[in-house]
From Swiss-Prot:
Monomer. Interacts with the flagellar basal bodies. Belongs to the YcgR family. Its main location: other. Disulfide bonds: none annotated. This is Flagellar brake protein YcgR. One of its GO terms (biological process) is bacterial-type flagellum-dependent cell motility. GO terms for cellular component: bacterial-type flagellum basal body. It is found in: Bacterial flagellum basal body. The keyword Nucleotide-binding applies. Acts as a flagellar brake, regulating swimming and swarming in a bis-(3'-5') cyclic diguanylic acid (c-di-GMP)-dependent manner. Binds 1 c-di-GMP dimer per subunit. Increasing levels of c-di-GMP lead to decreased motility. The gene is ycgR. Keywords: Bacterial flagellum, c-di-GMP, Nucleotide-binding.
Length: 252
């Protein structure tokens, strides 16, 4: 997940310690997944406790031991969170290994500043076209559909349809209980609101250039469980693509 540009985010900075602690407490209370990134890796964590009296906050170890070792060796880390309708971003200096409720955890100073960005759009990750991921279900008139996923975010997603294919929806029409299959990353049943259709050229697995329609949808609502599942899936997809790109570059 990319960070917000330096030129645009300064208007969203918060420097009041009480406000920063309140935001961190909300993340803790809602058990919101946070992404921790540094020069040598990234992992998903949860904020466990905020301790303003000692100017510390505690967050959980990652699920992979080597990721935790790399994090402890990092001089600076960035924490990015994307709760519904917002993006939160701040940096931490060197972490400490502590015990919290008899389990290993990280401790860091409460950040001196934090960016709280109200967003209409979320970080969007492109979906690999081979193997394809699909969204399927029924139109309001009862006919079935199955489209290839183009990209996805916590705010919505794009689908590819062959140009000229029948699409019985108008602006603001809703698809109920659409099955979004992210393969090993989960199957989600979601309500989708249609936004627009645009022509786009794509290259298929045979190397052929095709003109398709990109159908844009937004999610009408996400339950906390759906949001957490999608956030994890998006993170893993982005991580997978980064690893493929790095492997390709190393092979040049």
């Amino acid at each position: 997940m990319g960070t917000v540009s330096e030129t645009s985010k300064e208007q969203f900075v918060k420097k009041n310690k009480l406000a920063i602690c309140a935001i961190l407490r909300d993340l803790q209370k809602n058990d919101t997944a946070v992404m921790v990134t540094h020069a040598r890796g990234q992992f998903i964590s949860r904020i466990l406790d905020i301790q303003p009296e000692t100017n510390q906050f505690i967050f959980d170890f990652g699920s992979v031991e080597n990721e935790n070792v790399l994090a402890l060796g990092a001089e600076q880390l960035t924490i990015i969170v994307e709760p519904t309708g917002a993006k939160i971003e701040f940096t931490c200096n060197k972490l400490k290994h502590v015990e919290y409720l008899s389990l290993p955890a990280f401790s860091s100073a409460i950040p001196e500043q934090l960016y709280f960005i109200q967003r209409r759009e979320y970080f969007r990750v492109s979906i690999p076209q081979w193997p394809a991921y699909y969204c399927s279900g029924k139109f309001p008139d009862g006919t079935q559909y199955k489209y290839t996923l183009a990209d996805i975010s916590l705010g919505g997603m794009g689908l590819y349809a062959m140009k000229g294919s029948e699409f019985p929806l108008q602006g603001c029409s809703v698809l109920r209980d659409a099955a979004v299959d992210l393969c090993g990353f989960g199957l989600f049943k979601l309500d989708l609101q249609f936004i627009r259709a645009l022509d786009k050229q794509v290259v298929n697995n045979k190397g052929e250039t095709l003109t398709v329609q990109r159908l844009s949808f937004k999610f009408l609502r996400l339950s906390p469980i759906q949001e957490k599942g999608l956030q994890r899936a998006i993170f893993e997809l982005e991580k997978q693509q980064t690893a493929k790109a790095r492997k390709f570059q190393e092979g040049l």
